[in-house]
Amino acid sequence: MQTILTNGPTSNRLNIVVLSEGYTNSQLAQFVVDATNAVNALLSHPPYQEYRNYFNAFAIKIASNQSGSDHPSSGIYRDTYFNSTYDPLADYLITIPVDSTGQGKVDALLQSFMPNCQLPIVLVNDPTQGGSDGFGTMAIASTGAVSGEKPPYPPGILTHETGHVLANLGDEYTAPYSGFPDTEEPNTTQQTNRLLIKWKVWVSTNTPIPTPETVGEGVVGLFEGAHYHETGWYRPELNCAMGNLGVPFCSVCSEALVLAIYQRVRPVDGFSPASTNFSVSTNQALTFTLSLLQPTMHNLDVQWFTNGVARSGATNLSFTLSPESLSNGTNWISARVNDLTSLVRNDPANLLSQIVTWTVDVTLPQLRLDSPLRLTGGKFAFRVSGNAPQGFVIQSSTNLLDWAPLETNYLVAGQFWHTNSAAGPSPRMFYRAATPP
């Protein structure tokens, strides 16, 4: 297996694996080039382009005895590793057997080299455009198809097939497909009640339902014709990559793909402290840090909380606070990360949000000043008591803002008596005892 694209650990990336089909041993070097071009083409199209950093890509080089693929309609048969074939009736459709001679081989290779693969792509070395979704399990595309969607060209067959595999998007074709199950997908529906349409959050109140084609491009509505039916089935927009080659995904399909990415990848790549449950017993400042997986064109939103209360201005990747600002006992420090992309309007499972919470048990020394005594000569004394194993500092202030140290000492049997050294009248003075940081 050869790495094509690395953006981070495979445990938190959407891992693409491209497998060679119809490449002889002498053509495997070209396969790596073709696989790289295929990945770059796919990730150049929205919404993948915005989330390119969320992907890794790899190539598995498997030699075939012969180059190309079967074309039964032309009487051409090739001896290839995955036994791919163009459909005899629809020569744009490429499939591999679902048994151990095709799909089983793909599964075995992925299990050996990349068990955490979320998007397998079988790249067929054939100039005739074609592909399929491998019955929902993988994207299959020919080199002839991929060459037509490299930048600056628009999305094509490969991009279309990944919509099936990643987001379970449906075909928006209107030509009949006998026996195709009448199951709705994220972008197809039979529903005509405006209030019940699954993508209603994208539909403007002044858009007619059903929506006439005269409304034009870029308007989300309810356009008749989808799911291999001319009538009775509806799609979100007039044109979309799930119905036409050479056009981008519509808003609803783009949303479904972004949600599909976040089903597999979390926005928080790492955090510090690594332990989310710890104790503190000193005043040393605590710093919490996030490592985020940022999209290409916008940044994720961050908000820090202490005990459920949002901290004003705490929106950076790190957050520092003093344990003194927390109560003794159990406290919770949380960071909420949101992707506020305009590509998603409906996220019922909150996939675009992640919260990291640290449970911090605070046991800071508790000091008290009490039992003031008036002494002769204008002096006085008071007692410091409580718990301060690392010692304490007595400080004084005339305004409660500026504090000056007077004495550093330790408690003996839980207490200490302080006597002021100044004789005679003195200005009003405030005193406190604090533990060192």
Annotate the PLM regions.
Residues 285, 297-299, 328-332, 389, ...:
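Extracellular Ig-like/FN3 beta-sandwich strand-entry sites
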Residues 1, 266-267, 332, 353-374, ...:
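Low-complexity, Pro/Thr/Ser/Gly/Ala-rich linker/spacer regions in secreted
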Residues 317-330, 419:
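Solvent-exposed segments in extracellular or luminal domains encompassing
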Residues 13, 285, 299-303, 379, ...:
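Exposed beta-strand and adjacent loop surfaces of beta-rich binding modules
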Residues 361-437:
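Short, composition-biased motifs enriched in small/polar/acidic residues
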Residues 1-24, 36, 40-178:
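Active-site-proximal segment of zinc-dependent metalloprotease catalytic domains
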